[in-house]
Amino acid sequence: MIEAKLWRAGRRKIEVGHVWRPAEPVRGDGAMGTREHAWLARGPKLYRMAMIDDATSRVGARWVESDSTGANLGMLEWWLRRSGRPQSFYTDKASLFRTAEKRRRDEPGVEKGAGEPPPTQIGRALRELNITWIGAHSPQAKGRIERFFQTAEDRLVKGLQAEGVKTLEQAHTYLEQEFLGWWEPTRTVKPASSDDAHRPLDQEHDLTAILSHVETRQVKNHYTLEFERRLYAIERTDMGTGLRGAAVRIEKRREGSLAIRFGEALPALPRA
């Protein structure tokens, strides 16, 4: 009938399934993610933040009340102090990791500007630690961290409900003692290679400074500077050559204190 042109064969649509990214052969690549879910049903709203080693599926996880820059930097610090610096770092393409200008430039057909847009605070910290950031194009590209969340949304939620967990403190206890205690022996695997590509934290890697909120300010003639609508004065005993009119690095630490860095770190800033 086709040859007689009495019937025309239609094109058959072939469904292409998602393919999970294969595991890395050696330890040293991490993936990080945050999942909002009704973890405690009628309890407080919580986010589940986790980081996983791509080769072994070893996990670090915590509850946070917001998916903020500070919370993500805290998760990163935990990983760095436990394992060292990973070679690369998979996340989604949220604004915490990639600026709006960077996202716009990455769109097809958008002309690339002459200069690279400034990184986010997390992007800057990764750059100072010499860790490559990789923005996953899909949940499947993040691999093991997405499968971890799939398991958590089933098994963890059921466990929290069965134990009657209602508070953040109770959720922390159950997560550490029960869920991660089950995950470690049952879900982690041996890597294809015994090598570990993590790199140690060197002397120049001051995590308190690197994992701060960092901005640049110019010192005025009277050795003052403005930050967050406040005026701060630098003590005369801390003044170094060339400080007047210089651009200095302001570090707002995660516990709230401020420090100024001009070559060497200076004491926390007093208000003018």
Q: Where are the regions a protein language model picked out?
A:
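A generic structural motif
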Residues: 65-66, 92, 238
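Basic, flexible linker segments flanking DNA-binding modules
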Residues: 1-38, 104-117, 196-207
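C-terminal, beta-rich DNA-binding module of retroviral/retroelements integrases
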Residues: 178-272
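Charged alpha-helix within mobile-element recombinases
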Residues: 115, 121-192, 197-209, 249, ...
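Acidic/histidine-rich, metal-coordinating catalytic segments
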Residues: 80-114, 136-139, 196
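An active-site-proximal beta-strand-loop segment
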Residues: 32-59
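Active-site beta-loop-alpha junctions of metal-dependent nucleic acid enzymes
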Residues: 44, 61-88, 111-112
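Mobile genetic element proteins and their domesticated derivatives, centered on retroelements
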Residues: 1, 33, 51, 57, ...
